[in-house]
Amino acid sequence: MGISYGVKIAIEDEKIELVQADHVFGAAQVVVTNSNGESVGYTGDFKNPGKGTPILNTDVLIVDTTYGKPTFRRKFRDEVEVLFSDYVNDSLIYGPVRVYAYYGKIQEAMKILRKNGISAPFIVDGKIKEVTDIAIKYGL
């Protein structure tokens, strides 16, 4: 069963809502609200708080992350995306460029490259193509 972001689903006396988490395709934060209006939020890894990942306004927030300290920030994300795209573009002059990444991250890299004007074809194996097709189908 697929559930879209922002849709509240009632289960007995509670409502559950998925909120986008800018991490990998399909990542979500979860907010559970009880009949008294009290809410608990849960989030795993995310990026770009306040920009790509909405900041949850809940009574209780559970954060389960790889880098749990506020000092772990990637302040130069936009610049890194441009540098990555420029590097790939410059390297294409010499032939195919291989980018190795795991599920979710390879689709993110593909999206960044397209956003920055790289039009070279992507050649991927079957499983990555399946995941990518699903991401495209759902607008991720």
From Swiss-Prot:
Which protein, by its recorded name, is this? Uncharacterized protein in lig 3'region
- Supply the InterPro entries for this chain: RibonucZ/Hydroxyglut_hydro
